[in-house]
Amino acid sequence: SGKSEKCTLCYPRIESGNPTVCSETCVGRIRYLGVMLYDADKIEDAANVPAETDLYDAQLDVFLDPSDPEVIAAARRDGVPEDWIKGAQESPIWKMAMEWKVAFPLHPEYRTLPMVWYIPPLSPIQNAAEAGKIGMDGAMPDVQSLRIPVKYLANMLTAGDEAPVVTALERMMAMRSYMRSKTV
């Protein structure tokens, strides 16, 4: 349109069952949409956990496993359409946030329980590792010595809890190493 417009999450497209334009056309494949089943009765408790570092885990506890037969039966009883249940079972968000645990909500300490999930970035490491600028842990770079400090990422994504961020970075680093070994 030639003018700046605010994101509306392409709600007319979403309502008609189509993905947003940005997720459909993203060359870098960094934008994904997915259905998440959740227990609405747990939202208030999750937002009110006393310790900020428990907010990330509390938000994960709100989500329901779309492969669990009891969850599927309850969803059907509550009138959730079959295609939504199937969408939840195939959701890339479920896989990244719940199964692989590499995606995180932004600033959970604000207690808004955002439903936008972020994958922490891996630093471009090959040249830095070869130049000795970052530490190595065997054949892989040490995630504690990446260019973006783990503490900084944890403060943005898990209210300061570093353990889930380190686990995610190590998983992604292992995947990077594996994929590189297949092509290099």
What is each of the regions a protein language model found here?
Residues S23-V184:
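Long, compositionally biased charged/polar accessory segments in the mid-to-C-terminal portions
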Residues S1-E24, Y38-D41:
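Ferredoxin-like iron-sulfur electron-transfer modules
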